[in-house]
Amino acid sequence: MRPIFVFSAMASAVILSGCSPVISDTLLSPAERQERSIEHARAAVKAQKSGNLANLRSELDAAVVGRGGDARARADIGQLMLDFGRPDMAIQVIEPAYKLPALKITPALWNVAFSAATKLDDKALAVKAKTNGLASAEAINLALDRPAAGDRDKAVLILNSLDAIDFLQSKAVDRPADAIKLAEKLAGYAKQSPLALSRCALAYAELSGSPKDLDKAITLAEDALLFAREQGSIAAVVVRLKDTLGWVHLLRGKPQDLDAARLFLREVVDENPDSATSRYHLARTWEALGLLDRAITEYQRVLFLRPDDSETKQRLKVLKTLGGESSGPVK
């Protein structure tokens, strides 16, 4: 499972590429903008339930504007609506972006559209989302062959490339070879972008798994963390990169890797205790180390944060049949 962190589009542009700042000092921090957007999204759900259409529209607009007002913002809020169990409202949020040019639409938006269409059994929208997502990913692939017009354009292209890799790897498309190629291309395009290098590391580790590519993945993940610290990246980015490095160590699976994974992932969970993904990675580490009681406790914490996680439920069930028990209360 991949760590999931959401940033405003403009803030991410500075974070990802080491570019000169383009954000006004008067804007909220990325964390504050994220929290404010979540509040508006929750208010929109309440307005929809009560039938207050005026409030529904204003809260959705505020949530989108709070993330930057672009297609990426709509994808972020659409994903929140999916997380809230409202695929119908996810569609409401993302529809206004459908007519934008391919390069202006992050593939994450089409990922949201495909997920919502699947939940709503809308086959036509599912086909449209997959087709348009592939077109967007190809446009991004071609754009990586050209020099960026400026720092902001380069940073946005990096962000969209990350989303394109996720889209190619998703259940909607399932093109692992294409995802690896795009990740390699992005790492070459943005040689000092921590998240670009980290994403390439994930592609090698999750999609290839060959010993040679796993070694490459470790090197890339280590470089990503080093660059982030040198560039003074915000804490949320550093935590994400440590999570990736720990996860990649676990996937390589040598004895020294398991110790490294344990150290990194325990640190990540201490710094970000509400991350279900990081807790899942730590649970997998305890499982690999044979510490089943600890693994069970951590899987239970994952389900507390993410109740519908079917993979975690299955792993927990298997461990309990092996005789493991929870090592403490779930908090």
Describe the residue ranges of each PLM region:
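Short coil turns that delineate tetratricopeptide repeat
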Residues: 68, 102-104, 138, 191, ...
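Register position in tetratricopeptide repeats
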Residues: 49, 83-84, 115, 119, ...
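Canonical tetratricopeptide repeat
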Residues: 76, 112, 160-161, 199, ...
